[in-house]
Regions:
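C-terminal catalytic/substrate-binding lobe primarily of soluble NAD(P)-dependent oxidoreductases
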Residues: 19, 157-389
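Short, conserved SAM-binding/catalytic segment
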Residues: 51-59
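Structural motif
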Residues: 8, 82-83, 108, 325
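Conserved Rossmann-fold cofactor-binding substructure of NAD(P)-dependent oxidoreductases
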Residues: 64-83, 87-94
C-alpha cells in the first residue's frame, strides 16, 4: 500500500466553502513543513487557481482538475496520492466513486460524512476490498463525530486507569455550542430523507443504534428522543440533533476495538438546558424545533468573525461503582465549519504520517487514530480534552 506518491493527501472539494477553510488551515499551519505534501483538487482548474492565490497557497502545491463524473479522472487523482480528504457531500450523492476508487486502489480516505445509511452500505460493500488492498477508510472526521467518538475514548481510558475496567453507562452532554449549523449537514439530512423514499429498508438502519456495528446487537439504549431530567447533573436535557450519527459511530468504535467499552455498553447524547422551569421550557422548545432550518446552503457558510466567535463544550460522564468520572472536550471555533475544517485536516495528516501500522478497513476515528489524533488536535487544532474530576 501507498507506494511512492506525489502527495501525502489531496483536498478534494477545495473550491467549496469548507474545502477553502481546510486549505486556509493547512497554509497557516503547514506551509513551511516540507514533510507534508498536499494538493488541491476540484472540478474547475481556474477556481482552484483562484483559491490557491487568495489563500496564499505555496507555489508548487499541486492543483488537480477532476471530473467527478469520469471514473478515469477520479482514478488519476487517486493514483497521485496516499490519501484523499474529501469535503464534497452529501456523500450518498457525490462520494460513491471517490471512496470506491480509494478502496480498490489501496489509498486512504477521510471525509465529513454524517449519513449512516450510506455508511452502512459502504461498510457492507467495501470492507473486504479495503482489507485486501490496505486502504484505510475513515468516515466522520468532522464535528460529527470526532469530539464525541474521541471524547468517549478519552473518558474510558481515564475510567479504566482508575478502576481497571470501563464504564458501561456513558452520557454525552452538550453544555455549550455556538455557531451556525453546517449547510452540508442539512443537505445530508435532506438527501437521506429522499433516499428513504427509494429504499424504505433504510428506516431500520437509521433506527438501530448498532447498525454500523458489524452485526452486533447490543442492549437497549437509554432514551434520547424527548426531554428528560438528568438527576445526576441536576439539569434538564433535550434531544441533540447529531446524536443519531454520533451514537452509531461510538458503538461502531466499540465493536472495532473488540468491545473495549463492554458488550453491555450504553451511551446517549443530549443537550444541557439547565435546571428548574426555565430548563424544562428550553428543553421542550428544543425538542419541538428544527435546529437545521436556518442552516446555510451547501457551499455557503458563516463569516470569519462568526466562526472565530463560535465554540463548543461537551461533557462526558462515565458511571462506575456508584461514582461518576467526568471529562470534557472543548473546541475553540464554531463546530460546523471552523473546528471541522481543522479536525479533518489533522485526521488526514495523522492517518498518513502516524498510523502506518494500521491495517486496511473501514474505520471510525477512535479505533483508527485514537490517542494519536487526540494529541494532534490538542497541539494544533484548538481542541482541549480535560479530566474534570
Amino acid at each position: 500500500m501507498n507506494n511512492i506518491k506525489e502527495y501525502d493527501f489531496v483536498v478534494y472539494g477545495a473550491t467549496g466553502f469548507t474545502g477553502k477553510l481546510v486549505v486556509e488551515y493547512l497554509v497557516h499551519k503547514y506551509s513551511n513543513n516540507p514533510q507534508i505534501k498536499w494538493a488541491l483538487a476540484g472540478r474547475n482548474l481556474q477556481k482552484l487557481e483562484s483559491v490557491a492565490a487568495s489563500k496564499n497557497v505555496p507555489k508548487g502545491t499541486g492543483l488537480l482538475e477532476v471530473d467527478s463524473n469520469d471514473n478515469a479522472s477520479i482514478e488519476g487523482m487517486v493514483s497521485k496520492t496516499k490519501c484523499v480528504l474529501t469535503t464534497v457531500g452529501p456523500y450518498q450523492l457525490y462520494g460513491n466513486d471517490i471512496v470506491s476508487a480509494c478502496a480498490k486502489s489501496g489509498i486512504d480516505y477521510v471525509d465529513l460524512c454524517g449519513e449512516p445509511g450510506w455508511m452502512h452500505e459502504k461498510i457492507n460493500e467495501l470492507t473486504e476490498t479495503a482489507r485486501e488492498t490496505g486502504s484505510r477508510i475513515v468516515f466522520s472526521c468532522g464535528f460529527d463525530s470526532i469530539p464525541f467518538d474521541l471524547g468517549v475514548l478519552f473518558l474510558q481510558n481515564e475510567v479504566t486507569r482508575r478502576y481497571g475496567k470501563p464504564s458501561v453507562n456513558v452520557r454525552g452532554r452538550v453544555r455549550e455550542m455556538n455557531g451556525e449549523f453546517s449547510g452540508g449537514t442539512a443537505a445530508s439530512l435532506g438527501a437521506t430523507m429522499a433516499a428513504l423514499k427509494e429504499k424504505p429498508e433504510l428506516f431500520a438502519v437509521l433506527a438501530n443504534p448498532f447498525s454500523l456495528s458489524n452485526g452486533f446487537a447490543g442492549p437497549d439504549q437509554p432514551a434520547d428522543n424527548k426531554p428528560i431530567f438528568d438527576d445526576k447533573l441536576d439539569t434538564w436535557v433535550a434531544p441533540f440533533f447529531m446524536a443519531p450519527i454520533n451514537t452509531k459511530n461510538v458503538h461502531r468504535s466499540n465493536a472495532l476495538m473488540n468491545h473495549m467499552y463492554g458488550k453491555d455498553f450504553c451511551y446517549n447524547e443530549m443537550w444541557v438546558m439547565g435546571p428548574g422551569d426555565d430548563g424544562k421550557a428550553a428543553a421542550d422548545f428544543i425538542s419541538s424545533s428544527n435546529p437545521l432550518s436556518n442552516a446555510p446552503k451547501p457551499g455557503e457558510g458563516p463569516s470569519r468573525e462568526s466562526r472565530e466567535n463560535g465554540n463548543y463544550d461537551i461533557l462526558f460522564c462515565g458511571d462506575i461503582n456508584d461514582e461518576s468520572v467526568h471529562v470534557s472536550v472543548v473546541g475553540d471555533m464554531d463546530p460546523g465549519y471552523g473546528s471541522t475544517s481543522k479536525m479533518i485536516a489533522e485526521s488526514a495528516i495523522c492517518l498518513v504520517k502516524e498510523c502506518k501500522d494500521l491495517n486496511g478497513g473501514i474505520y471510525t476515528p477512535a479505533p483508527s487514530m485514537g490517542t494519536k489524533l487526540i494529541k494532534r488536535l490538542q497541539d494544533n487544532a484548538g481542541l482541549t480534552f480535560k479530566i474534570e474530576n
